């Protein structure tokens, strides 16, 4: 048995991994980090052991910082101390494939440490897709700077199709069947529009790390909105629909952390330090 169904303090039935389930999650994390070695083939050479250690350290530090909460909503969602930035760094350093796998590995670790699973499909979107989207920072990896426009357009298209198809396969039972395709097309448009806005803002900023971070945070926000809309609409404030509630609720904590992080990243001493760390990560 990989999980138990237990009742939490609010009377909700949640899925909690058993010991075997936790072991499997750890194995998955290690496997994903190992797969990063193969995705690095798009670069001039494979990831070295040192670079793989940098990925693991980013996950570990991101996990530690995720527990330093500057603000926490009672119903979920927190403004943490730079935790999303730490998860974005491997993608920015080593490319899109490595970034996505690192983000998913981080999501699995979060599920291992603090699971909050009401539906199996929610596990996919809240832990795998939302945190995996932080790896989209790889669209601005140094190796991709010569093809930024091509990579960003591909990211928008990929994100749109992924959001629409994930909704069709996983969440149509929560929406009227006759309108499920229309809902997912509309959500895909929202996904693509938000990514386009993030990219436009990113091009206005000279710092590539800030661009990468904005794009990655936008990706996480989209999946957080989808989860809130479908699974947590019953928590909506009086007079609010599920989708507007999810849009505002998730924006409050995700973009608040993003704003604090961007301000910190633009400080000259921090920019210099981040450049030195990147050079160290990419050095032979």
Predicted regions and their residues:
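Loop-helix junctions at membrane interfaces
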Residues: 1-284
């Amino acid at each position: 048995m990989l999980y138990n169904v237990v009742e939490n303090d609010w009377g909700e039935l949640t899925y909690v991994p058993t010991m075997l389930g936790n072991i499997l999650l750890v194995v998955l994390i290690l496997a994903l980090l190992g797969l990063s070695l193969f995705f690095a083939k798009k670069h001039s050479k494979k990831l070295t052991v040192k670079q793989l250690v940098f990925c693991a350290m980013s996950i570990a530090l991101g996990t530690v910082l995720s527990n330093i909460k500057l603000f926490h909503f009672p119903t979920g969602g927190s403004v943490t101390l730079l935790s999303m930035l730490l998860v974005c760094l491997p993608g920015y350093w080593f490319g899109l494939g490595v970034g996505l796998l690192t983000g998913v590995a981080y999501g699995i670790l979060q599920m291992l440490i603090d699971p909050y699973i009401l539906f199996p499909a929610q596990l996919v979107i809240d832990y795998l897709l939302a945190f995996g989207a932080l790896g989209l920072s790889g669209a601005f990896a140094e190796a991709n700077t010569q093809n930024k426009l091509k990579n960003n357009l591909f990211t928008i298209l990929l994100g749109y199709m992924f959001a629409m198809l994930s909704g069709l396969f996983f969440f149509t039972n929560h929406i009227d069947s006759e309108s499920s395709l229309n809902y997912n097309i509309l959500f895909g448009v929202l996904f693509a529009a938000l990514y386009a806005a993030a990219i436009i803002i990113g091009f206005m900023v000279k710092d590539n790390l800030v661009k990468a971070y904005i794009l990655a945070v936008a990706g996480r926000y989209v999946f957080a909105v989808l989860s809130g809309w479908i699974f947590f609409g019953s928590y909506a404030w009086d007079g609010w629909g599920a989708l507007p509630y999810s849009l505002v609720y998730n924006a409050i904590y995700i973009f608040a952390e993003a704003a604090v992080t961007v301000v910190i990243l633009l400080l000259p001493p921090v920019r210099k330090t981040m450049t030195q760390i990147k050079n160290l990560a990419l050095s032979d």
